[in-house]
Design a protein with these regions (language model features):
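Composition-driven, intrinsically disordered low-complexity tracts enriched in small residues
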Residues: 19-22, 629-709
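Sec-dependent N-terminal signal peptides
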Residues: 1-7
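Beta-propeller-forming repeat regions
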Residues: 24-33, 42, 49-54, 74-76, ...
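Short amphipathic beta-strand segments in non-cytosolic proteins
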Residues: 63-67
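C-terminal segment of classical bacterial N-terminal signal peptides
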Residues: 9-19
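Short beta-strand elements bearing conserved aromatic residues within extracellular beta-rich modules
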Residues: 58-61
Length: 709
């Protein structure tokens, strides 16, 4: 074991932060997401605070139609109902300025802290070489695919003979399914024989790209791909596989599929094109097929598609828009372009997306380099390729985002480093002299401000400013998850069995006093994904309050198991899925070497009150009550405040809001023109909210305990 390596701190460069020009962003319209779980002391109930709601929105909780709470709940979005039972049903009503809003969907009580989602497991097959294979559930992503305000799941099925790019051999076809949370299958897409199976081949994006309120699915396709309604893309008979199982010839496409039906909506040639295989770093098919993908708000308002090829040598990143049924190119960044050659070989096995320069538009953090929203180079740290990276406001005591990255190249001065996400300035680093394969960033120790970072290879556990806490870091360097009742992040990993070749999901808590972990959850009956990497199918804030859920496959892959926390928390935050950075991180989580999502603000011990999401939703044909509610809140709040400021006028009428599921408030266009069917749901004026309920936001974060009733 290497000794803890020396810390190198680089003198700071003072950069004046820009004033953000952020416009409201198109985001998903979600329901309240109520979940109720039977626990030993009654029933745990939690729900969402939506991004379009005022910070002082209150809530009433109803069991079997009778209100549970004695006073409006304003400091949390969860409670323990001591009188609840397994046969109870629950719904939640928002309370705005003393007026109770329409009810959420009514939910039944889960018997356990998980819910099984049935799957339609595909039958296995046989390759041209005679090898048999079976399927297991693999990576997943979510979006509201049908416009009902609830998340649906898009799941990748991985054949048992899937390959790393460095491995030769045929593979079974990659298959994608879409499911509702009750297990209803919406469609199946078969990628066909000309798409190889493996972690680096089929990166899939699930997001509402055209703003119709329903998510699309974007994947690289080829001749023989069959969409969700049985239509074949390109030739149904072409077979471009060579004798080693690689696909190094034939057309490549980029296809947008309907999230609701799986039908191919638009297909274009894939950019970046394959070209000459050897121009990507080898001639046998390894480096040419290293793909990444992400979603980015390149105009600051609407989401764009980002696809890439290559990161060991040549790198090409291409951005597309899907609008009005058409795919159009936005820009292409190529390290072969004059002036970009220094950016070659700087990519990671994953990417991140955030507005790092605070101009309201997203950048692509592509490992050691970052590309600006306009497709031009922003900076390059020259630290080269790496396997793990974390981007967030990791240090709340300095302006902007930080990047914690581990590096593979043993010739580089740092095996792990933290750099300024806006400028690329390396703030500090640790020399390791070896491939530092994994690294994590999360707030796991409240004794030090900001996140802690850790890695192997002698890096140790360190503060975000580089101070060594312990030469023995947590052994888990996988995922972090907000799970229990405090603001620290827990560790999500797996119990790996080398003999069985599988891992069982687990969540643990780091004890910063003893330097050990305690087990919070063993997901018995589940398996992790992607071999020793031990990643879940998905980790995200899918239901309930702001804390995260996790999806693991069951041992036989006939179900996905959705776990949720049942710990009462006194902290109240907007749903993480309405945070700009977090939602995009969920979209790219499945890409190559999966990484955990982070927020746009520091979420941890000692945090400040985070800003309310600046967002709007598109609701052409909303079919659920709460969409109207969520989008009426801002208009109602503004009307009441205007009336209060002008007492000689009659107060704004409130009739109809209780019974009308889709009120039509006045709309205000964003600084850049919004779609005609857009409805803004940005935050209320903070000063107005404070006058309405002094100290409500800070109390909600740091003050009173959640009710136990």
């Amino acid at each position: 074991m290497l000794a803890v390596a020396a810390l190198l701190v680089i003198p700071a460069i003072v950069v004046d932060p820009k004033v953000s020009a952020a416009a409201p962003r198109q985001m998903e319209a979600l329901t309240r997401g109520v979940v109720a779980v039977k626990v030993s002391g009654g029933v745990f109930v939690s729900w969402r605070l939506l991004g379009g709601e005022a910070a002082n929105t209150g809530f009433n909780v109803y069991r079997n139609g009778t209100k549970v709470n004695s006073s409006v709940i304003t400091t949390s979005t969860n409670l323990l109902d001591a009188s609840g039972s397994s046969s109870s049903t629950y719904y939640v009503r928002a309370v705005v300025n003393g007026v109770e809003r329409p009810a959420s969907n009514t939910v039944s009580v889960w018997a356990n802290n998980y819910k099984d989602i049935p799957l339609d497991k595909p039958a296995g097959g046989t390759t041209p070489s005679g090898e048999s294979y079976t399927y297991s559930a693999n990576d997943a992503s979510v979006a509201d695919l049908d416009g009902d305000g609830e998340y649906e799941i898009v799941l990748k099925w991985d054949p048992s003979n899937s390959k790393d790019n460095s491995q030769s051999g045929y593979t079974g076809n990659v298959i994608f399914d879409a499911y509702k949370m009750n297990g209803q299958k919406l469609w199946r897409i078969n990628m066909g024989k000309n798409i190889r199976a493996g972690a680096h081949y089929s990166q899939f994006l699930v997001y509402d790209f055209d703003g119709d309120g329903k998510g699309e699915v974007v994947i690289k396709t080829a001749d023989g791909t069959v969409d969700g309604i049985g239509q074949v893309i390109g030739s149904s008979t072409a077979d471009y596989r060579n004798s080693s199982g690689y696909v190094l010839s034939g057309p490549e496409y980029l296809t947008v599929f309907s999230g609701q039906t799986g039908a191919a909506l638009a297909t274009t040639n894939y950019v970046p094109a394959r070209g000459t295989v050897s121009s990507w770093g080898d001639s046998y098919g390894n480096r040419v097929d290293r793909f990444l993908a992400g979603v980015a708000y390149l105009d600051g308002v609407r989401p764009s598609i980002v696809m890439s090829r290559g990161y060991y040598t040549r790198t090409v990143i291409a951005a597309f828009d899907f609008r009005n049924g058409s795919l159009t190119s936005r820009w292409t960044f190529d390290t072969n372009t004059s002036g970009n050659s220094a950016y070659a070989g700087q990519g990671n096995h994953s990417l991140s997306v955030a507005d790092v320069d605070n101009d309201g538009k997203d950048e692509i953090i592509f490992g050691a380099m970052t590309v600006d929203d306009n497709g031009q180079k922003l900076y390059n740290t020259n630290m080269g390729h790496g396997d793990a990276m974390h981007v967030s406001d990791l240090n709340p005591n300095r302006a902007g985002f930080e990047v914690f990255k581990v590096n593979e190249d043993t010739s580089k001065p740092y095996g792990a480093q933290v750099h300024d996400a806006a400028t690329g300035q390396i703030l500090w680093g640790v020399y390791t002299g070896t491939d530092t394969g994994r690294g994590m960033a999360a707030d796991i120790d409240p004794r030090y401000p900001g996140a802690e970072v850790w890695a192997g290879s002698g890096v140790g556990l360190r503060t975000i400013t580089g101070q060594l806490i312990s030469s023995t870091p947590p052994s888990s360097q996988n995922f972090g998850i907000w799970w229990d009742g405090d603001l620290l992040r827990e560790l999500l990993d797996h119990v790996w069995s080398g003999s069985a070749g599988v891992g069982v999901g687990k969540i643990e808590k780091w004890n910063y006093n003893t330097g050990a972990v305690s087990r919070l959850l063993t997901a018995t009956g589940t398996y992790s994904n992607n071999s020793t990497k031990g990643t879940p199918s998905l980790q995200a804030d899918l239901i309930g309050d702001w804390r995260e859920e996790v999806l693991w496959r069951t041992e036989d892959s006939t179900k996905l198991r959705l776990y949720t926390t049942t710990d009462v928390t006194a902290y109240r935050l907007y749903t993480l899925m309405h945070d700009a950075v977090y939602r995009l991180a969920v979209a790219w989580q499945n890409v190559a070497y999966n990484q955990p999502p982070h927020t746009s603000y520091f979420l941890g011990d000692g945090m400040s009150t985070p800003p309310a999401p600046s967002m709007y939703t598109t609701l052409p044909q909303a079919s659920f009550t709460e969409v109207g509610t969520a989008n009426a809140l801002l208009a109602e709040q503004a009307a009441l405040e205007e009336a209060a400021a002008a007492p000689e006028q009659e107060p704004a009428p409130q009739t109809g809001l209780e019974t009308d599921p889709q009120p039509e408030p006045e709309t205000t266009p964003a600084p850049e023109q919004l779609p005609d069917n857009s409805v803004p749901t940005g935050p209320v004026d903070p000063s107005a909210a404070a006058q309405a309920a002094p100290g409500a936001a800070m109390r909600a974060l740091l003050g009173q305990a959640a009710p136990i009733l």
